[in-house]
């Protein structure tokens, strides 16, 4: 049966030997196209290889269990909502008991939990090296095995380089955090200023009132859309449900760039307002802060610290702690185990903080800032008529107290 099938295939194409002799590049593909043998079902070497791969996968899964658990806790902490500080929180922040509070919360800190894999690994390496050196010193091993020891002079010379590398790495991450914070300060200030200009410039009557209400909703929706754009796992449909209407929300959800779609809603609404050119140009100029905010946020999200710098810091730390027990053996002996533990916990903690704040937006209280913008706009709308009527009443009272010729009435 298989011979007949192979003959039928060969009859429609050039002979295999002739094709391979003239065009060797087609030989592999041709063999694959006419491979009509049924799959093997016997328990031969292939089944042993698959069983070996299964054991390897299980071993890899076992070794990755603790790092995956630590990463899951860290990512869960990144998605927690931050809150703005109040006076009570600042008092607690300055409290003399803060060190005790920070110490007691160590086991729930995602920074410390993320240090478990590297610190445990390097401490285990220190235990292995200390055990080996002790076995050699006690003649438990043949004399050909040397004691792993070295001079501490190379470490004394390279320690300042490692310290500077960690400092510069953390400082670069903090600069990104500070840049993201300033960008959002400008976004919130620009949003509030644009809303204030709309409230003051647009009449609250007729069609203008409808457009004004929609425009203020779009302005309040912009920081929410940008927040969902820069924070992974945000639910923009839930966050915007109470701000804008359902048909507008569906259009925003279909857009590839949702913050710019909200800006387009704002621009079109401004164009529909019956304003003179000066006021319209003023409102358009206020939107420059929103465009700049989008640019800065996308730059921070898409361009990390140069990867060569991050990798250099990581490799330096790894090689440093792999050889640290060898360097300290002559002076510390078994004390190299706690010394390696303390060194790894300290230095990797500094590096971990730099990695966490490199992405600044999960560290900021963006949800509360967006809620603050919404509440500020609502308060400004409610107080607009009250303040306007009060000022008009004061003007009328002032005119009533003065005569037509400018003399004050006694």
Curated annotation (Swiss-Prot):
Regulation: More active at positive than at negative voltages. Repressed by the general anion channel inhibitors dithiocyanatostilbene-2,20-disulphonic acid (DIDS) and niflumic acid.
One of the GO BP terms on file: photosynthesis, light reaction
Phenotype caused by lack of the gene: No visible phenotype except stronger photoinhibition when grown in the field. Slightly reduced proton gradient (delta-pH) but increased electric potential (delta-Psi) across the thylakoid membrane leading to moderately elevated proton motive force (PMF). Transiently decreased non-photochemical quenching (NPQ) during the dark-to-light transition. Slower NPQ induction on transition from low to high light. Wider thylakoid lumen thickness, loosely stacked grana and disorganized stroma thylakoid system.
GO molecular function, one term: voltage-gated chloride channel activity
InterPro entries xrefs: Bestrophin-like (IPR021134), VCCN1/2 (IPR024701), YneE/VCCN1/2-like (IPR044669)
UniProt keyword terms in alphabetical order: Chloride, Chloride channel, Chloroplast, Ion channel, Ion transport, Membrane, Plastid, Thylakoid, Transit peptide, Transmembrane, Transmembrane helix, Transport
Residues exposed to the Stromal side: 132-147
Pfam families documented for this protein: Bestrophin
GO cellular component: chloride channel complex; chloroplast; chloroplast stromal thylakoid; chloroplast thylakoid membrane; thylakoid membrane
Transmembrane segment boundaries: 111-131, 148-168, 316-336, 337-357
Subcellular location: Plastid, Chloroplast thylakoid membrane
Membrane topology: Multi-pass membrane protein
Catalytic activity: chloride(in) = chloride(out)
Tissue specificity of this protein: Mostly expressed in flowers and leaves and, to a lower extent, in stems and roots.
Topological domains annotated Lumenal, thylakoid: 1-110, 169-315, 358-410
Stated family: Belongs to the anion channel-forming bestrophin (TC 1.A.46) family. Voltage-dependent chloride channel subfamily.
Function per UniProt: Voltage-dependent chloride (Cl) channel critical for proton motive force (PMF) partitioning across the thylakoid membrane by anion influx into the lumen during illumination, thus being required for photoprotection under fluctuating light conditions. Influences thylakoid ultrastructure, including lumen size and organization.
Name the record gives this protein: Voltage-dependent chloride channel 1, chloroplastic
Organism in which the protein naturally occurs: Arabidopsis thaliana (Mouse-ear cress)
Lineage of the organism: Eukaryota, Viridiplantae, Streptophyta, Embryophyta, Tracheophyta
